[in-house]
């Protein structure tokens, strides 16, 4: 009672998105009014997510008797059900960057992609329980997620929204998780347990392996290269590349580049990149920002 269930931030950072008492609210960071978007006392509305374009909010609700994915305008109004699932428990709606689809997983180990027109695609079904670790590519055409293998390790899979193709990004020989696409769509970063340097405890004389996790990347295509390779900075003569010699410093700097993710499945596992030397730590997750991890 009186507890905030979960929360998020609007794309502009000006309002908070909060679920509490079974309803969905938006709250101003500084000035304005608090809006109760759903205003229902007969349902449990939860796990709300703001679309990247800021126009809609997705949430999960049991108002129909079973949990479904709903969307509502960010200013309020009538909500709309996008799904017609049976008896399922749904979790973690994640918008595509293009704001045209929502990924969600259920308690049966399945990932679904729900388009705004109501089309639902089952991406993957795991026999080992819920898949909670999934991320969209910046072009909204690919998704990366972690599955459990027969050996009990985590392995990363890639799914093409256009073709439905599944690609094995890591084979499960080493535990891998927390996939995150680079902003330019050329690399897939992830965490993996690949180095084991056990230490002896000072008092109990037991071996402890606590620094096995490192940050790695896969070059998604043959042209992606290694972003952490040796650099060779050169001086560019004035006038090269642009009439005023400021191609990257003037108007072009603010233009958004179109990202088109290309995945070459052949040899993907061989294009493995160690992000930072001696970076083994107890790392739990790997979120990606525009130009940083």
Regions found by a protein language model. Name each.
Residues 25, 66-70, 110-112, 152-156, ...:
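Structural motif
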Residues 8, 49, 94, 135, ...:
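Conserved beta-strand position repeated across blades of beta-propeller domains
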């Amino acid at each position: 009672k009186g507890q905030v269930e979960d929360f998020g931030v609007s794309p502009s950072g000006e309002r908070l998105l909060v679920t509490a008492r079974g309803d969905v609210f938006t709250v101003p960071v500084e000035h304005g009014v608090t809006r109760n978007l759903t205003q229902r006392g007969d349902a449990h509305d939860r796990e709300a997510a703001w679309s990247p374009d800021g126009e809609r909010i997705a949430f999960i609700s049991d108002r129909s008797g079973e949990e479904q994915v709903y969307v509502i305008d960010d200013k309020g109004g009538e909500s709309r059900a996008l799904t017609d699932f049976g008896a399922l428990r749904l979790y973690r709606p994640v918008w595509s960057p293009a704001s045209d689809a929502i990924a969600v997983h259920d308690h049966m180990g399945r990932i679904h992609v729900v388009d705004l027109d109501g089309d639902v695609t089952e991406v993957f079904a795991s026999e080992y329980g819920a898949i909670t670790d999934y991320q969209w590519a910046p072009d909204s055409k690919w998704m990366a997620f972690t599955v459990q293998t027969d050996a009990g390790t985590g392995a990363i899979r890639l799914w093409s929204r256009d073709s439905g193709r599944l690609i094995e990004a890591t084979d499960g020989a080493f535990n891998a998780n927390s996939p995150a696409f680079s902003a330019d769509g050329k690399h897939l970063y992830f965490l993996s347990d690949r180095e084991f340097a056990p230490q002896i405890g000072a008092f109990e004389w037991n071996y402890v392996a606590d620094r096995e996790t490192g940050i790695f990347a896969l070059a998604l295509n043959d042209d992606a290269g290694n972003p952490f390779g040796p650099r060779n900075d050169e001086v560019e003569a004035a006038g090269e590349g642009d009439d005023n010699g400021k191609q990257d410093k003037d108007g072009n700097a603010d233009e958004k580049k179109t990202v088109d993710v290309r995945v070459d499945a052949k040899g993907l596992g061989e294009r493995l990149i160690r992000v930072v030397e001696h970076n083994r730590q107890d790392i739990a997750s790997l979120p990606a920002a525009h130009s940083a991890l």
